[in-house]
Amino acid sequence: MRLAGPLRIVALIIIMGLTWILVTILLGGPGVGLPRIQQFFTSPENSVTAEPRARKYKCGLPQPCPEEHLSFRIVSGAANVIGPKICLEDKMLMSSVKDNVGRGLNIALVNGVSGELLEARAFDMWAGDVNDLLKFIRPLHEGTLVFVASYDDPATKMNEETRKLFSELGSRNAKDLAFRDSWVFVGAKGVQNKSPFEQHMKNSKHTNKYEGWPEALEMEGCIPRRSIAG
């Protein structure tokens, strides 16, 4: 009975020694245990190779714009539920989060030289006064960039003068806009040719994505800055 105590101590020492040896073998010695564990948990049998994320540039563009160009992305509203977005040089000019969009036409005026936002407003083209829109776009200065995104209905209140002014800004489709069409457009005061930055989706019960509305439009690209001389 007197040997029971010493035997227990010897047994405990042996167990501790064996445990230390086992841990050393498994973990590879001091300082390398964590990498060994990580290698086990990330072995081919236990790991899934993650796809590398594609790099995004200003406004989420897949490629950077050249020097002296402005990066932009415009998304029209979806039906009468999701508001439009206008992004320029990684700055959100208009969106539901900024609480500055509304039914109708959402328009941001930008200095074509500096890229600075001049003014942003929404114009109700269903129940609003079209004269408010005319007062906004008639006095534009040469070289001003005009970003437009529709939401719900862009055209019911449009008159001949409104369509003509947008056409003079470079639009091909302003003359044909109708009730609940989707429209995104970038034009400029003083352009000689039609803008390459425009999309138009007709409201048609045969092709509408939503009940009573066409699908939302999304457009992105690079706009050359205007020279100071115009």
UniProtKB/Swiss-Prot annotation:
InterPro entries noted in UniProt: FAM3 (IPR039220), ILEI/PANDER_dom (IPR039477), ILEI_FAM3C (IPR039475)
Protein name per its UniProtKB record: Protein FAM3A
Transcription regulation keyword on record: no
Signal peptide (UniProt feature, chain positions): 1-33
Gene this chain is encoded by: Fam3a
A GO BP entry: ATP biosynthetic process
All copies of domain GG-type lectin, residue ranges: 68-226
Family as reported in the entry's similarity comment: Belongs to the FAM3 family.
